Amino acid sequence: MGICLDELRLQVIRPTLQHLRAWNLGMENLLLGTAAQESQLGFHLKQGRRHGLGIYQIQPHTHREIWDHYLIDYPPLASKVRGLASQRDFLDHPHSELTTNLRYATAIAWLIYRSADVHKIKEADAANVTLMAQLWHQHFHHGPSATTQDFECSYAQLVSGADPTDSAPRYAGAQLPAHPPAPRNSPGSGGLNGRGARQPTA
């Protein structure tokens, strides 16, 4: 897992949606699920040669479309979103905000859903993971490989079944030794003179 679940929810997603006057629990959960599926809650910010960026893996062309074809019709909303971005860097490197600015990236992720007429999720469906998976796959997903089942599995593992205060990455590879190695110059360590000296489809 990447970012602490509770902190991502309470310090990033919720205040961003509140700033945009768009908060409801269902949308908050949908964005958490989107981050879980796209980047394992921020474990990956740029995956190999894929074009997606940040915790939501938003593609640059999608980012441009939101500004050029959607926000252009909503000046007050555009002003609120622009206020979340860096004052100067945004003008020179707008797409880098998707990686470095969590609240801005969250606003753009929400706008991707909003531009598809997904404004809010009913309170009764706030925990409906099947519905969220369908919304993600229909309006957000930009590659052919992942499925709604993948979204549901990511949500179950990283959102529903996660310790919300756990910020440690869950790595199943080689484990650290139970005892740290002895200092180089201590007896038996070998030392320097001893003998026993890692959106279009990407």
Where are these regions (language model features)?
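Export/targeting segments at the very N-terminus of extracytoplasmic proteins
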Residues: 1-42
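Substrate-binding/catalytic groove segments of enzymes
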Residues: 65-68, 89, 93, 113-129
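Acidic helix/loop microenvironments that form the catalytic cleft of cell-wall polysaccharide enzymes
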Residues: 35-39, 120-146
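Long, low-complexity, intrinsically disordered segments
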Residues: 182-202
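Substrate-binding/active-site groove segments that recognize
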Residues: 50-88
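Sec/Tat-exported extracytoplasmic proteins
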Residues: 16-20, 38-39, 45, 112-117, ...
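Long, charge-rich low-complexity segments
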Residues: 148-184, 190
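Alpha-helix-centered segments that form part of catalytic cores
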Residues: 88-111
